Every structure is written in structure tokens, then in C-alpha cells.
Amino acid sequence: MKLVDEAEILVTAGNGGNGCVGFRREKFIPLGGPDGGDGGAGGSVWIVADENVNTLVDFRHERTFKAQRGENGMGRQAYGKGGEDRIIVVPVGTVVINVQTDEVIGDLTQHGDRLLVAKGGKGGLGNMHFKSSVNRAPRQATTGEEGEERLLKLELKLLADVGLLGFPNAGKSTLIRAVSAATPKVADYPFTTLYPNLGVVSVEAYRSFVIADVPGLIEGAADGAGLGTQFLRHLQRTRLLLHLVDISPALGVYGEGGVDGVSPADQVRTIERELERHDPELLKKPRWLVLNKADLMFEDEARAAAETIVAELGWTAPWYLVSALGRDGTFPIMKDVMAFFDRQREDELEARNAG
């Protein structure tokens, strides 16, 4: 499924109903006092996170959301009925931003999270509130308040455990196909992945994690080059990054905009610079190196090339030599990832118990 991860919507809460000017009219009570009721409150607009929704695509077609207006007050001190709230359902992981102020209003990270984005107006006061010793028959009532209106930007950050990053054509889509049931488009040219893809990796029964295939990054990505920063945000919520590198760039024909002439080590350094420019915290995340396309070389050549790259980078974190296309060496990575998450959970539990 193509994942639309940005949308702008206009939300308008309901206006409050007007207060009523009314007087008590009953038999044998010819001069009844004021009894105009208050108007009902306008409906509010809420955004609710739902785990069964995984895209913002519906907001491409419907961008305006209005809550119901409150009903006017009536005689006999009857209050107007409040307007119904408007509920907007979004995927878990949606960030809501006020376009006018660029302020983050809320971050919906759990199923069922609710966020008030536009509050309904208060109902107007009926004339029963304006009776006094000098004005026993007031003909004064107030109108309902206007509901809030906001232009909002919705951003969807994938809630994935593992993020795949690398240059275009490094083999990220091929890897996610190899280890999960996801079926992203795969072809021999850059920018095949135009939208993030999610896959669930099942290591054992009831033991799995979510992996995200994010479109390839190139130099200048933090400034919007290539597919820009709109996909870098998806890496912010991952717990582990797998950095894929094509170890045989000289054997691949990438075409314009690709990575011709860029050594594997320089590919790693380039992406590290882009991550630091976009969000330095990303470089603090655990990151493992996955040297891909070993099938394009003889085994001893691939191993020697991999060791040279690791030495050139001074890489100290875990690294792997794989062929995503042939699924050679991919499953051991997934087992190690699962074990890494198990250790993380144990450490977090110990820290909570100690605290």
C-alpha cells in the first residue's frame, strides 16, 4: 500500500446557539417573567488515533471538517441542544501541527489517543439571566460564541522498530521482501521506493517486529534533494537502524541521479552527514551495517571487499555481508535484531525495578 504521509485539513468547531428572549405565558399569570433559555454549545472537533487505519490518503479527497452548531435556546427556560462533535480518525503515529503557528498540537502514539483540535463555541445567554430589580422584563439575550477554526497539518511517522536506510538502489526493498511478507516495488533503477513500506518480520511464533523500508537518501536529502526530508522523519521513532550499502557500485549501472563513482565507504559517510543535518539524535541510535549484493562477486572477493569497507570506516558496531536477492545471510540478521530487542526490554525492566 502506498503510504500518504502528509495532509492539510481545515477544522471548524460549531458555533454556540443563540440565547432566547421569551416570557412566561400561562393562564392566570398575565405578567410572567422572562424565561428565555440558553443556546446549546457548539460541537468540537477531535482527532482520534485508530490502529486499523494506516494511511492519510482519505484526506486527499476530504479536507474540510465541521462540527455541528448548537441549537438556539427556547422559552420556558429550555436550553438548546448541544452540537454533535466531529471525530476525525487518523493512523497511530500521526503528528498534528498548527499551520499558522507551526506548533505541534499533539502526537498520537497509542490506539485510542484523542486530541481536541477545535473547541465548540459557548451557547448564548437567554433573557432569564438579565432580570433585575430595575428591569423585570428584559428583552436582551446574547448570541452564541463562534467555534474555533484551524488549518492543520497531519504528518504520519511510521511506528516501526527497525528502519532501513541507504542510497537509492542499495537493496532495501529487496531485503524487506526477503524477510517479511511486504511486497514493495523492486527494479534496477534509483528511487523505486517512492513511499515508505512496512513489513512484519516473524522470527519465531509470537515473536516479531516491524521493519520500515524508507526511500533512498542522497546527498542533500536534509535540504529536500532526491525524495527529501519528508521521509527522514520516519526514522525518528525506530529503535534500530540497518544501514544498507551496495558493496559493488562499479558493477551497477545507476543512471542519472544515482551513485556512480561513489565508494561504499563514502556512501556511508554521505548519509551520516545527512542524518546529522536533519536530526543529530538519529546518529545516536544503534546502527548496524549491512553490506549487500555479495552475489555479484565471488565469495572471497566479497568478504575481502567487506572487510576493507569496515576497516576504512573504522566501524565498530555489528556488520553483515548478505545477498538480499538470494536471501543469503538475511535471516541471521533478523534473529540478531530480535535478540537485541529482547536485551533492550530486559534492560528497561531492570532500570524500572531499580528506580
UniProtKB/Swiss-Prot annotation:
Family to which this protein belongs: Belongs to the TRAFAC class OBG-HflX-like GTPase superfamily. OBG GTPase family.
Main location: cytoplasm
Enzyme Commission number(s) from the entry: 3.6.5.-
Any one biological process term the GO annotation gives: ribosome biogenesis
Identification of the protein by name: GTPase Obg
Binding partners and assembly: Monomer.
Function noted in UniProt: An essential GTPase which binds GTP, GDP and possibly (p)ppGpp with moderate affinity, with high nucleotide exchange rates and a fairly low GTP hydrolysis rate. Plays a role in control of the cell cycle, stress response, ribosome biogenesis and in those bacteria that undergo differentiation, in morphogenesis control.
MF-aspect GO terms: GTP binding; GTPase activity; magnesium ion binding
Organism for this UniProt entry: Xanthomonas axonopodis pv. citri (strain 306)
Residues noted as binding Mg(2+) in the record, renumbered to the chain: S173, T193
InterPro entries: G_OBG (IPR031167), GTP-bd (IPR006073), GTP-bd_Obg/CgtA (IPR014100), GTP1-OBG_CS (IPR006074), GTP1_OBG_dom (IPR006169), GTP1_OBG_dom_sf (IPR036726), OBG_GTPase (IPR045086), P-loop_NTPase (IPR027417)
Subcellular location: Cytoplasm
Boundaries of every Obg domain copy: 1-159
CDD domains (UniProt xref): Obg (cd01898)
